[in-house]
Amino acid sequence: MLLLEGAGLALAEQYAHPGRELSPDLEERLLAALERRSSREPLSSIFASAFFCGHRFALNADCLAPRPETELLVETALELLKSRLPLQSRSESGSESKAESNSASRPASSSAAEPRLELAELCCGSAAPGLSLLWELEQLQKGSASLFLGDLSGGAIYAAMKNAAALGLDKSCRFALCDLFPPEKEETLFDLILVNPPYIPRAEIFGLMPEVRDYEPHLALDGGEDGLDFYRRLAASAAACLKERGWLLMEHGAAQEADIREIFADWSQSRGSAVISRCDAAGHDRVLAFQVSGRKDNALS
């Protein structure tokens, strides 16, 4: 991985030329990276980037490095939103002709008459989840969605803007410095809001592994005394930002689902909200989705 990131040598090239000698400059750079890694600095900090959903995202000191388990947010959001895209952008069953299949596999263009999906990622950091979701939707149908990205950190917003431009998605994005919720001037109601909020209980931060404790921004980790402060704020106010049948999709800690369900009890009782839960690859509860609706959306069972 150090050779791949530090030297730009692809894995195939490393396997094809295992005895290749490194230039003095390259050797010096790799030794410096090794020294930093030996002091427990993570690769995402050393190289100021990380891979997520198959894309490389630029990071800085104000961004939490995206985790593999967070890809579940994107996967779940795609399941929820695909049913809302116009029919021509969805893959049909195997009964269609080869010509039809090839046509369906190409991204369609959204017509002016078709409403765009309005998406938001709050506490966005590098915006890896939100931009990955938007990129996938663009492959299904060009111009099908727009994305609001908000964060309290100016450095995080800078990284999000850089990443949106790198993926060619900047024209479909809006950015704002905000304390969790969009500013009042942002009047859009959203079809789906993604949030990976800080959820580590404050007292536990200093017991985390050095790669996280010493190099990740505590602003992106600290969820208050019990780790649930942001979920309480979301439960109190997020519904006002969502369309009818809109979804609030959140990542959470492995042992927090029951507490978050209790915090959101009013959504289920008074709003008739649908609730979806997803586990990560390790079998830990990881994602909760609540729908603002008088009737349940059957996009997922």
Where are these regions (language model features)?
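Glycine-rich, phosphate-binding/catalytic loops in enzymes
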Residues: 136, 209-212, 266-267
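Intrinsically disordered, low-complexity terminal tails and inter-domain linkers enriched
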Residues: 82-116, 136-143, 268-270, 294-301
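Residue-level signal for inorganic ion chemistry
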Residues: 2, 40, 70, 129, ...
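A general structural signal for well-ordered alpha-helical segments in protein cores
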Residues: 27-30, 40-43, 126, 130, ...
